[in-house]
Design a protein with these regions (language model features):
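N-terminal beta-strand motif that seeds the catalytic metal site of vicinal oxygen chelate
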Residues: 1-18, 45, 56-58, 107-111
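Core segments of cupin and vicinal oxygen chelate
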Residues: 8-46
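Vicinal oxygen chelate
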Residues: 9, 69, 73-111
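Helix N-cap motif at beta-to-alpha junctions
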Residues: 13-14, 63-65
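Short amphipathic alpha-helices within nucleic acid-binding modules
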Residues: 20, 66-71
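Short acidic/glycine-enriched loop/turn segments that link adjacent beta-strands
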Residues: 33-36, 54, 85-89
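Active-site beta-strand termini and strand-to-loop segments that position acidic
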Residues: 39-43, 50-51, 93-96, 106
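Short, charged/polar surface micro-motifs in flexible loops or helix N-caps
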Residues: 42-46, 53-54, 64-67
Length: 111
């Protein structure tokens, strides 16, 4: 029934964010026409939590958050402090358009 998922990042500077995803995070992409880049995402999982704020969140998962932060530092990109959460160790990257992107090393069981 469901064959995939399509996530959207809304940005004040979408062109800069697209280049960041492609060139800094090295996420493969295709040009679907007119310069509109669609990025390939790795296998994903979906959690549903209680709440009434109507917001959804997007996090990327990495194997080693310390190595991720070091790799971005080598590209002159600063990540937020690594914090412990019940479900993993998380950092945030501020995209060129100003949005924050969470990246975490999962400590929870994964499907």
């Amino acid at each position: 029934m469901i064959t995939g998922a399509h996530a959207m990042i809304f940005s004040k500077d979408p062109d800069a964010d697209r280049l960041f995803l492609r060139d800094v995070l090295e996420i493969p992409c295709i040009d679907s026409g007119g310069g509109w880049l669609i990025f390939a995402l790795p296998p994903a999982e979906l959690g549903v939590h209680g709440g009434d704020n109507g917001f959804h969140q997007l996090y990327f998962i990495c194997d080693d958050v310390d190595a991720f932060v070091a790799a971005l530092a080598a590209k002159n990109v600063t990540c937020g402090d690594i914090e412990a959460a019940p479900w993993g160790r998380i950092t945030y990257v501020t995209l060129p358009g100003g949005g924050k992107l969470g990246v975490y090393e999962a400590t929870h069981a994964r499907p």
